[in-house]
Amino acid sequence: MYRALTIAVAASAALLPTGCANMWDAITSRKFRDAPFKTVGKVISPEDPLVVLRADPPRSGDERAKAMHRLKEPARNNGTQEDQDQILDTLKQAATADSSPVLRFAAIEALGRFEDDRVAAILMTAYQTADGLTEAERAAPKGPDPSAVIPVGGTSASRAPTRTGIDPGMPLKGPAGYAPDTVSALRCRCLESVGRTHKPEAARFLATVAGTAGADTAAPGSDDPEVRQAAVRGLSNCRQPDSVVALAQVLKQESGKDVILARQSHAGLMKLTGKQLPPDPTKWDEVVQAGVVIAPEPTKLESAIQNAVFWKK
């Protein structure tokens, strides 16, 4: 009976426009065994994201993440100011301090769809805390370099060791925070989302991560090529004159060095200014010196055509 019901629901799911991935997740979940019709019903007619995110006690991480993916900004969808403030606080907590990287991803992505003036600052904080460490762990002194610890017995049979095996100051627990790949992915998502806020402070932050402010003021993660590429993508979407200045600097720095960064910065410059100039740093410096004017934002169709033409070159 259970197997027959699963097959029937799966077949029906293929005919529904609700998203086959969500339906498949539902019918293969433990909840489907306990309450199949209720589980499928929630996929076809999902619960209000505001209700899910406000639930007390909190819903499961999976439910909250899916609610964040469906979430629309209350202030732009007939919500109250109280709705806006509460949801923004919920997303801020999830994006900057949640123990689950999955929930952080979902919250950061949701914030990227908001137009609230507070979003840029939240996303920049989320970038800074993407390592997954708690405040206490971040403030704790670092343990000594393991390479500086001389093993028991010393380095020579004829000489007594000056230090023995375990340093008393070395922490005895494993590494804290997220894995490096997870940290990098979270930072990239933050940069792409902060670029969609179109705020001057967002452009300045992205420029710092992209490496235009010099080594002395480098942001955490700016030595990661993928993070720098995400910063350039963020600048390409951030419709501010400072973004054009930063992209021109990246193009100048990376021409003949990093092909990907140079190509991305050139694409961003053309997108923001509407000027179809070659990837010559000198010509783009002239544009900056003449005074930057941001071109009207292209429609989705125009953007698709521009991208297709650009990547065929």
Where would I find each of the regions flagged by the language model?
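Residue-level detector of extended alpha-helical repeat arrays and alpha-solenoid scaffolds
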Residues: R64, R104, A120, R187, ...
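Terminal, low-structured helical/coil segments at or just beyond the last alpha-helical repeat
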Residues: G274-K313
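Amphipathic alpha-helical scaffolding segments comprising HEAT/armadillo-like alpha-solenoid repeats
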Residues: V40-A55, N77-T96, D116-A176, K199-A218, ...
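HEAT-repeat alpha-solenoid elements in large eukaryotic scaffold proteins
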Residues: M23-S29, G61-P74
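Bacterial Sec signal peptide processing site at the extreme N-terminus
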Residues: A14-V43
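Short inter-helical turns and helix N-cap capping residues of alpha-solenoid HEAT/ARM repeat scaffolds
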Residues: R59-S60, S99-S100, A130-E135, T182-V183, ...
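Conserved hydrophobic register position within alpha-solenoid helical repeats
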Residues: A67, A107, R187-C190, A231, ...
